[in-house]
Amino acid sequence: VLILGTGYLGKALAESLRKAGHTALTADIDPQKAIYEADVADQASMQGLAARIPSPQIIVMCASTRGGGEEAYRNLYAHGTRNTLEAFSGTPVIFCSSTAVYGITDGRWITEEHNVYPSSGKNGLLIQAEQAVLAAGGTVVRLGALYGPGRCALASQYVTKGKALPGAMDRWLNYIHRDDAAAALHLLCTLREPPAGIYNLTDRTPMQMGEIYSYLSNLLGKPAPQPEPLPAEARRGFSNQRISCSRLMALGWEPLYPS
């Protein structure tokens, strides 16, 4: 397995595969984080990577923009996906995307059959990358918000600043623990035939933001944060949806952290 991007999720996936006896090769723009240094946004870099390593059985693209803007998305996802597919033509690819591409704002349940709505330029670039992977017979995994050891933006904002994330308290949020995400990708990598198509990757329990803050308030003995009203144009940029992960669970994956 070749893992492109060894950040929060990619590192956990590599460790999981190696513990199970699989060979996990890693590549990252930061040479301190991976076996190979490579920049997916650079065509020559990816061609060089393909020349240096054995032909992988499968590739997992889980690089992150690390909070970058639209140009970072274009380089990493639009250019990076194209460069990867060209350099490793014929190799199955698993592309880590986001449930944000659905762009639903009315709280309905969402499956992989729902249409996607590019509510922002960033989401449009993610959709473009997804389409390229699917056209090549690959797999798209749409992840909810990652959390786990040392990482949870919602809790961090509340604990350190006493503030809530933007959006209404009745907004539905969809999370996935890093270890569960790594386990799901591990499963997809090691199935006899890599399943093409789209898979949602969230825990089994969407929760409203106010419900989460109420739980944290009781747990920590702190007042729950107050929501800040947002103008209508800002509200349209925040998804409000409940994501189903039934398709992935049908393959045998079960989250250790179901809520």
Language-model features and meaning:
Residues G10-K11:
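N-terminal Rossmann-fold NAD(P) dinucleotide-binding loop
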Residues Q32-K33, E37-S89:
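NAD(P)H-binding glycine-rich loop region in Rossmannoid oxidoreductase-like domains
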Residues R82-G121:
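Conserved Rossmann-fold NAD(P)-dependent oxidoreductase catalytic core, especially the SDR/UDP-sugar
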Residues S98, Q128-P149:
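Conserved beta-loop-beta element that borders a ligand/cofactor-binding pocket
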Residues Y117-S120, G144-P149, A168-R178:
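Glycine-rich "substrate-gating" loop/helix at the edge of Rossmann-like oxidoreductase active sites
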Residues G124-I127, L146-G162, P166, D179, ...:
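Glycine/proline-rich active-site loop of Rossmann-fold NAD(P)-dependent oxidoreductases
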Residues A182-E233, S239:
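Mid/C-terminal beta-alpha module of Rossmann-like enzyme folds, strongest
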Residues R236-S259:
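C-terminal amphipathic/interface module of NAD(P)-dependent oxidoreductases
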